[in-house]
Amino acid sequence: MIINAKGPASFAEKYIVRSIWEDKFPPGSILPAERELSELIGVTRTTLREVLQRLARDGWLTIQHGKPTRVNNFWETSGLNILETIAELNPDGFPELVDQLLSARSSVSAIYFRGAIRNNPEEAIEALSHLSELEDTAQAYAEFDYQLQHTLAFSSGNPLYVLILNGFKGLYSRVGRYYFSSAEARALAMDFYKQLQQLAIDKNYTDVPALMRTYGINSGVMWQSLRDDMPVDLGYSDN
């Protein structure tokens, strides 16, 4: 098992998670005793204990006082916060994961974009007020797009959408930088932003779903033209 990590805690966490992913520690099984596991991984028991607590918070494990640590079925117990981990664990499936992520985001964003323009059109107008100053670079577009999503999610009146976005911020940011490296993708996005801006000015929230649907289809086609050339390390976080 080859694991790239920046320190003992990171190594231990990735070792355990990969072992769960590869069914060496299958769902429902009991982890080895703390001393045995710390020796197996090569970290101190203190470090291991901290890692186990963190993995329990993320839904990988169940820790109960006086009982052995049990491995969970993470598909049932974890949240969006493990998306980046799954991307690292399954690089061959990363393009499909991104497809699913973008599809889910498009479906959800149609709801909160409409809500934002209905409930707080002034905030939507403000968020889109500096389009002429947006630098024509992948980094600038990726940052603007995420911030726009975040602002409108919060302005929609349902802050839970913000938490959903926060769950895949790192992964979405990296994919966004790659997607917006295409000048055509940036031009497509700018056209969408301008149309959205006009809807906000007109307080026309009823036409937002149709605009979102059209942009979702067009950006999806654009993504399909780019996905096969994605860098192999795009799914890896900096941790």
Curated annotation (Swiss-Prot):
Keyword Lipid metabolism: yes
Alphabetically ordered keywords of this record: Activator, Cytoplasm, DNA-binding, Fatty acid metabolism, Lipid metabolism, Repressor, Transcription, Transcription regulation
Residue ranges of every copy of the HTH gntR-type domain listed in the record: 6-74
Entries under CDD domains matching the protein: WHTH_GntR (cd07377)
GO CC entries: cytoplasm
DNA-binding annotation, residue ranges on this chain: 34-53
Gene Ontology terms describing biological process: fatty acid metabolic process; regulation of fatty acid metabolic process
Localization per Swiss-Prot or TrEMBL: Cytoplasm
Pfam family, one: FadR_C
SUPFAM superfamilies in the record: GntR ligand-binding domain-like, Winged helix' DNA-binding domain
Annotated TM spans: none
GO molecular function: DNA binding; DNA-binding transcription factor activity; fatty-acyl-CoA binding
Described function: Multifunctional regulator of fatty acid metabolism.
NCBIfam families the UniProt entry points to: fadR_gamma, PRK04984.1
Subunit structure: Homodimer.
Protein's UniProt name: Fatty acid metabolism regulator protein
Source organism of the structure: Shewanella pealeana (strain ATCC 700345 / ANG-SQ1)
Source taxonomy: Bacteria, Pseudomonadati, Pseudomonadota, Gammaproteobacteria, Alteromonadales
